[in-house]
């Protein structure tokens, strides 16, 4: 066993710089490839297929999307490919400035028919939704968005794509990997560990890996939270209607999550908090800005716009 481990250690020591560069490039490439080649991957994942056929984008949804693009002032040369998605919220990927463009999935529920029809079967986490139950009625109401709320939801995705935030979000992994490697190598040189036993260096490397992962988790979550807050503020700053739509959008998300919490029973309690936020997968991480925080932030913007002092 010592032979293969020793040869592996020697190989890593000899080619550590090349391995580091390759690993960093690989981490960046894997994350960015989803946005460099969004079509048809994203559409395959989120396309709405009623009765076994892909649903074409309706004139109503296309008009809504064009209205949002006009409000934001998207340059005519930027490429967007909207499609009808089965999700409750819009989805997007890509870089509209590049030839491959960006894709935006517009929820079919924006048409209203899927929500108002109580005979339509919807299965969430393996359970059929009873639209006539109190929780089902609340969920149906939460999925019905006003025109302003729909525009905010779509505009948020367009602002995200136009800003290039996707590229920024791919940086923590390679940066933390390179930083962990550089600091650990420098520390081992300073402590003289390269002249000591391999077991001691292995233990030090293990500690460095743990510290590096903690740094990655903290930096990635902090960046995500900051960008989501900026994204909401930037979208809401388009007009008072977008602020109002944003408040409604997050109110409806919280209401829908509370309805799902009731519909799914114990599983729902594991997925959603009593306030309607999503329960983090890991206790030590905050993967996203809480919906209550996002709603309250926009609510403050709305109150500032309608206050007498504003005029």
UniProtKB/Swiss-Prot annotation:
On the tree of life, the source organism's domain of life is: Eukaryota
Record has Methyltransferase as a keyword: no
User: Residues on the Mitochondrial matrix side?
Assistant: 1-17, 186-197
Residue spans crossing the bilayer: 18-38, 165-185, 198-218
The principal location of this protein is mitochondrion
Keywords for this entry?
Membrane, Mitochondrion, Mitochondrion inner membrane, Transmembrane, Transmembrane helix
Might you report a single GO cellular component term? Answer: membrane
Q: How does it sit in the membrane?
A: Multi-pass membrane protein
Q: List localization entries.
A: Mitochondrion inner membrane
Mitochondrial intermembrane side stretches:
39-164, 219-311
Does the UniProt entry include the keyword Lipid biosynthesis?
A: no
Which InterPro entries does the record match to this protein? TMEM177
**Subunit structure, as described in the record:** Found in a complex with COX20, COA6, MT-CO2/COX2, COX18, SCO1 and SCO2. Interacts with COX20. Interacts with COX1, MT-CO2/COX2, SCO1 and SCO2 in a COX20-dependent manner.
What the protein does comes down to: Plays a role in the early steps of cytochrome c oxidase subunit II (MT-CO2/COX2) maturation and is required for the stabilization of COX20 and the newly synthesized MT-CO2/COX2 protein.
What family is this protein classified in?
Belongs to the TMEM177 family.
Q: Which PANTHER family match?
A: TRANSMEMBRANE PROTEIN 177 (PTHR21824:SF4)
Name it: Transmembrane protein 177
Organism whose genome encodes this protein: Rattus norvegicus
Gene of this entry: Tmem177
